[in-house]
Amino acid sequence: MTIVLRPGSVPLHHLADIYWNNGSAKLDPSFDAAVLKGAARIAEIAAGNAPVYGINTGFGKLASIKIDAADLATLQRNLILSHCCGVGAPLPENVVRLIMALKLISLGRGASGVRIELIRLIEGMLEKGVIPVIPEKGSVGASGDLAPLAHMSATMMGEGEAFYQGVQMPSKDALAKAGLSPVVLAAKEGLALINGTQTSTALALAGLFRAHRAAQSALVTGALSTDAAMGSSAPFHPDIHTLRGHKGQIDAGSALRNLLQGSEIRESHIEGDERVQDPYCIRCQPQVDGACLDLLASVARTLEIEANAVTDNPLVLSDNSVVSGGNFHAEPVAFAADQTALAVCEIGAIAQRRIALLVDPALSYGLPAFLSKKPGLNSGLMIAEVTSAALMSENKQMSHPASVDSTPTSANQEDHVSMACHGARRLLAMTDNLFGILGIEALAAVQGVELRGPLKTSPELEKAAAVLRSAVPVLEDDRYMATDLKAAIEVVASGALVSAISSGILPVLEA
């Protein structure tokens, strides 16, 4: 499916479609006129003698050097080639597709002054499956994501490497196979392509989409754990959460309440249970997961604005003047990435404590040790819980803020930077870890509710358990566990666990 982009008003769910489905995108034709107008203004400046940054001058600390008109195309080509300094593994294809779509949005507002040919080329690359090889490391998040976006731009010029329908090859060959021609950059176009926050923003969006899927999954696994531990649903009473007033908490409490509705296990111990209160990892799920949902909603608002922004420099303004500014500084994205990291860390931390509760017979209210039917002879989920602790601890270390760690670059011209790019990139690893924790919780919780038989859990949670059991059989005796963990994690990461739940129960992501 091809998403039609209207710069300035692209909704978050369109960007999520591109990310989750390796989608294509194109600019709404009604924006072509703005692009043509901006390009004409830059061509007019390039034909004159007045020095304007990025059009007929050097870059960064070299901005005071005037460039001859005959060298303007060479200036832009040199800019791209010299800035291709990324290192590390290539970014995932769906992230690069998101980068390219975000660049279409930014350029499509007409304030960058690029020709319509660049827009058409990016659209064609997305449609035909020409995906630039962008090394994952090299940006400090100001002045824009220079190195990664230079690698994207190099492919447009026929330089560097690209994937064509999943196969890596020289960019010129990828373009040729797709029937596309490389571009010769005109005045300012190289700068417009690399001077923006699109790499950081795409990575932050990927982290957000994954974190929200995990947050939804955690409500399902948390409800399963609550029933497996014969926990109380009383703390999910709506009035408790309304009295506090936080939307995320209200939504989380509602989800947990609805997920547990109709559980035979819960009905069996409403009366006569000598326990007065459950541990916090059961009782305080709405407060913890709800706070994380609120944090992700705040991030969503920031990133939807940034996704629709023009983050180039200089910009062609509405009065046709060309003015230098600092929209390339990715501080909002850096803060958003740090916020997402906190939410990811805490969702995993409380989930891990639920796993620990379920495998401990001193806490699990009658479940066998490590959820094994024959403990002693079998170790059950003993080391699966240890793995979840390792993943949780790793996320704690990675959750420390990146945004406060500025360092001066480029001969002190770029003396404060955001560190948004690696702050956002770590979210991929952190959400992988979180999917791991939640996959292990799903294994433990489903095993736990089954051990409560013949009593059944709720109809909604039965559907979730069935999805897990379609991938992982019941653990009767010890077996090679890595296969089980991998399959359970995929059930969570793929969204299959969330998809099993009836629409309207789990909170959706809204900016």
Swiss-Prot record:
Q: Entry's InterPro entries?
A: Aromatic_Lyase, Fumarase/histidase_N, HutH, L-Aspartase-like, Phe/His_NH3-lyase_AS
Concerning NCBIfam families, the annotation shows: hutH, PRK09367.1
User: Among its keywords, does the record have Cytoplasm?
Assistant: yes
> What protein name applies here?
Histidine ammonia-lyase
Q: Which GO terms describe its molecular function?
A: histidine ammonia-lyase activity
**2,3-didehydroalanine (Ser) modification, residue list:** S143
Its pathway is:
Amino-acid degradation; L-histidine degradation into L-glutamate; N-formimidoyl-L-glutamate from L-histidine: step 1/3
Gene that this polypeptide is encoded by: hutH
Query: Which residues constitute the cross-link 5-imidazolinone (Ala-Gly)?
Result: A142-G144
This protein's source sits in the domain of life called Bacteria
EC numbers listed for it are 4.3.1.3
Query: Tell me, which GO biological process terms does this entry list?
Result: L-histidine catabolic process to glutamate and formamide; L-histidine catabolic process to glutamate and formate
Q: List the GO terms this entry assigns under cellular component, sorted alphabetically.
A: cytoplasm
User: What keywords appear on the UniProt entry?
Assistant: Cytoplasm, Histidine metabolism, Lyase, Plasmid
Tell me where in or outside the cell this protein is found: Cytoplasm
Where does this protein chiefly localize?
Answer: cytoplasm
PANTHER family from the entry?
A: HISTIDINE AMMONIA-LYASE
PTM comment text: Contains an active site 4-methylidene-imidazol-5-one (MIO), which is formed autocatalytically by cyclization and dehydration of residues Ala-Ser-Gly.
